[in-house]
C-alpha cells in the first residue's frame, strides 16, 4: 500500500509530453525558481500558454493539456482537453486526477464515439470512484488521505463546441471580441461551488435542512461544517462517507455528530456551447489567480499583450497584486521560499487557450497537432527542463 501511495506522488512530479525534450528546448517547459512555464505551444484549435507558480511546500495544483485524439478510436473524435486541478490538504487527489481523468474521458468517448456532457459526467464519476478505492486501501496506514481533495475544472473543445465541467472554485473565462466597440469582453463560463457565494450557501442549506450548522462563518470566512470552503470536489472522503470520519483521522477533521448522506458532492456543473468566430481565447485558472485579478483584468492583460508568455504574464500580475496587498515589493516576494510563500499567495495555475476560428470550426475528425503536457513544480526532474529564458 505504501508503494501505491509513493507511485501516486511520484507521478505528480513527472512531466509528460509525447515529444522528446531536447537539450535547451522548452518542449517540457522551463523552470525559474518556483515558477514553471510553457510560453507557447500548438493545439488542435490554435495556440496555448501555460504557467504554474508554487506557494505550498508540496505543489497542490496540477494541470494538463491534451490535444489530438479524445478517444481510443482512429475515427476520433479529435480536439483539445484542458484540466486544472487545485488540490487541498495535500497533492494526492490532484495527482490522481491528472493521471486518470483524461483516460476515463477517452474510454467513455470511445464507447459513445463522441464527446458529450454525459461522457464528462461519467469521467468524473469514474475518477471519484477510483480515488475512493485508493483511500480505502490507504486508510489503515495513512488515514489522513481521507481529508485530501481537489477542485477539478475541465474544458474540451471538439467540433466547434466547448464543453466545460467543474467542481470547486477554479474558473474559466472567455475573451469575446465585441465588434461594435472593439472591446474584448470577459465572459465567465464555469459555475463555482464556494460557500462564500450566497446562492451556493442557500443551495447547500436547502439540501441539508435538518443541519443548522451545514455552513459556518469561521474567522470571517464561510466554510462547510466549519472545515472547507468548497461544497463540491473530488476526494474529501471524510465529508462524503461516515466510515472515513472517525479515528484515527485527526480530530480537527472529525465531526461531532454522525452524518447519513454525503455532505460534499462530486457531481460537476456542466455547460455546452458552440464557439463563435468572435471568441478569441479562454483563460483556465485555479482560484489563486482569481483572488487577485478580476475576470476583466485577466482578459485585458491577455488581449493587450503578445500571445507568447501570456500565462506567465497573468501570474506575474497576480503576484504583483499579492505583494501590493502586503505592502511589499514584488522582487522581495519572489525571494520567499515555498511553504512560507503560502502566507502571501496560493499555488497558481494558468492555461490560456487561444482560439483560431478557422481551426475551431473544423469537424471533430480533424486530427491537428498532437500534444500531451503537464504543468510542474520544483519537484520535477531538472534534466527534463530547459533553463529559464528571462526574468518574470
Swiss-Prot record:
<comment type="similarity">
    <text>Belongs to the PP2C family.</text>
</comment>
<dbReference type="InterPro" id="IPR001932">
    <property type="entry name" value="PPM-type_phosphatase-like_dom"/>
</dbReference>
<keyword id="KW-0460">Magnesium</keyword>
<dbReference type="InterPro" id="IPR015655">
    <property type="entry name" value="PP2C"/>
</dbReference>
<dbReference type="GO" id="GO:0046872">
    <property type="term" value="F:metal ion binding"/>
</dbReference>
<dbReference type="Pfam" id="PF00481">
    <property type="entry name" value="PP2C"/>
</dbReference>
<feature type="transmembrane region" description="Helical">
    <location>
        <begin position="145"/>
        <end position="165"/>
    </location>
</feature>
<dbReference type="GO" id="GO:1902531">
    <property type="term" value="P:regulation of intracellular signal transduction"/>
</dbReference>
<keyword id="KW-0464">Manganese</keyword>
<dbReference type="InterPro" id="IPR000222">
    <property type="entry name" value="PP2C_BS"/>
</dbReference>
<keyword id="KW-0479">Metal-binding</keyword>
<feature type="binding site">
    <location>
        <position position="86"/>
    </location>
    <ligand>
        <name>Mn(2+) 1</name>
    </ligand>
</feature>
<feature type="binding site">
    <location>
        <position position="346"/>
    </location>
    <ligand>
        <name>Mn(2+) 2</name>
    </ligand>
</feature>
<dbReference type="GO" id="GO:0004722">
    <property type="term" value="F:protein serine/threonine phosphatase activity"/>
</dbReference>
<dbReference type="GO" id="GO:0016020">
    <property type="term" value="C:membrane"/>
</dbReference>
<keyword id="KW-0904">Protein phosphatase</keyword>
<feature type="binding site">
    <location>
        <position position="287"/>
    </location>
    <ligand>
        <name>Mn(2+) 2</name>
    </ligand>
</feature>
<keyword id="KW-0812">Transmembrane</keyword>
<protein>
    <recommendedName>
        <fullName>Probable protein phosphatase 2C 60</fullName>
        <ecNumber>3.1.3.16</ecNumber>
    </recommendedName>
</protein>
<feature type="binding site">
    <location>
        <position position="87"/>
    </location>
    <ligand>
        <name>Mn(2+) 1</name>
    </ligand>
</feature>
<dbReference type="InterPro" id="IPR036457">
    <property type="entry name" value="PPM-type-like_dom_sf"/>
</dbReference>
<keyword id="KW-0378">Hydrolase</keyword>
<feature type="binding site">
    <location>
        <position position="86"/>
    </location>
    <ligand>
        <name>Mn(2+) 2</name>
    </ligand>
</feature>
<keyword id="KW-0472">Membrane</keyword>
<keyword id="KW-1133">Transmembrane helix</keyword>
<feature type="domain" description="PPM-type phosphatase">
    <location>
        <begin position="47"/>
        <end position="355"/>
    </location>
</feature>
Amino acid at each position: 500500500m505504501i508503494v501505491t501511495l509513493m507511485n501516486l506522488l511520484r507521478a505528480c512530479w513527472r512531466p509528460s509530453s509525447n515529444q522528446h525534450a531536447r537539450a535547451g528546448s522548452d518542449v517540457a517547459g522551463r523552470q525559474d525558481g518556483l515558477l514553471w512555464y510553457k510560453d507557447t505551444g500548438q493545439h488542435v484549435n490554435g495556440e496555448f500558454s501555460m504557467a504554474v507558480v508554487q506557494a505550498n511546500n508540496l505543489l497542490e495544483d496540477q494541470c494538463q493539456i491534451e490535444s489530438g485524439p479524445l478517444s481510443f478510436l482512429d475515427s476520433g473524435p479529435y480536439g483539445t482537453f484542458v484540466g486544472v486541478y487545485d488540490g487541498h490538504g495535500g497533492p494526492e487527489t490532484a495527482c490522481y486526477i491528472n493521471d486518470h481523468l483524461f483516460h476515463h474521458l477517452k474510454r467513455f468517448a470511445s464507447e459513445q464515439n463522441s464527446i458529450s456532457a454525459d461522457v464528462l459526467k461519467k469521467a468524473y464519476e469514474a475518477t471519484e470512484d477510483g480515488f475512493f478505492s485508493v483511500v480505502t486501501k490507504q486508510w489503515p496506514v495513512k488515514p489522513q488521505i481521507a481529508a485530501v481533495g481537489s477542485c477539478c475544472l475541465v474544458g474540451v473543445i471538439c467540433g466547434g463546441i466547448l464543453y466545460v465541467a467543474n467542481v470547486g472554485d477554479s474558473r474559466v473565462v472567455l475573451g469575446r471580441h465585441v465588434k461594435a466597440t472593439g472591446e474584448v469582453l470577459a465572459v465567465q463560463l464555469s459555475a463555482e461551488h464556494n460557500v462564500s457565494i450566497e446562492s451556493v450557501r442557500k443551495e447547500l442549506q436547502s439540501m441539508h435542512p435538518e443541519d443548522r450548522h451545514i455552513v459556518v462563518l469561521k474567522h470571517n470566512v464561510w466554510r462547510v461544517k466549519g472545515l472547507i470552503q468548497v461544497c463540491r470536489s473530488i476526494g474529501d472522503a471524510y465529508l462524503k462517507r461516515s466510515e472515513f470520519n472517525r479515528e484515527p483521522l485527526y480530530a480537527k477533521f472529525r465531526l461531532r455528530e454522525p452524518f447519513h448522506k454525503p455532505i460534499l458532492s462530486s457531481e460537476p456543473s456542466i455547460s455546452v456551447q458552440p464557439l463563435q468566430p468572435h471568441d478569441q481565447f479562454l483563460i483556465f485558472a485555479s482560484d489563486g489567480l482569481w483572488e487577485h485579478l478580476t475576470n476583466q483584468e485577466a482578459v485585458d492583460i491577455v488581449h493587450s499583450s503578445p500571445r507568447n508568455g501570456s500565462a506567465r504574464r497573468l501570474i506575474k500580475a497576480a503576484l504583483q497584486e499579492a505583494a501590493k496587498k502586503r505592502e511589499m515589493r514584488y522582487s522581495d516576494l519572489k525571494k520567499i521560499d515555498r511553504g512560507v510563500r503560502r502566507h502571501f499567495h496560493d499555488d497558481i495555475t494558468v492555461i490560456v487557450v487561444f482560439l483560431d476560428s478557422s481551426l475551431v470550426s473544423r469537424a471533430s475528425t480533424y486530427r491537428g497537432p498532437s500534444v500531451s503536457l503537464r504543468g510542474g513544480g520544483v519537484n520535477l526532474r531538472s534534466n527534463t527542463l530547459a533553463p529559464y529564458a528571462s526574468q518574470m
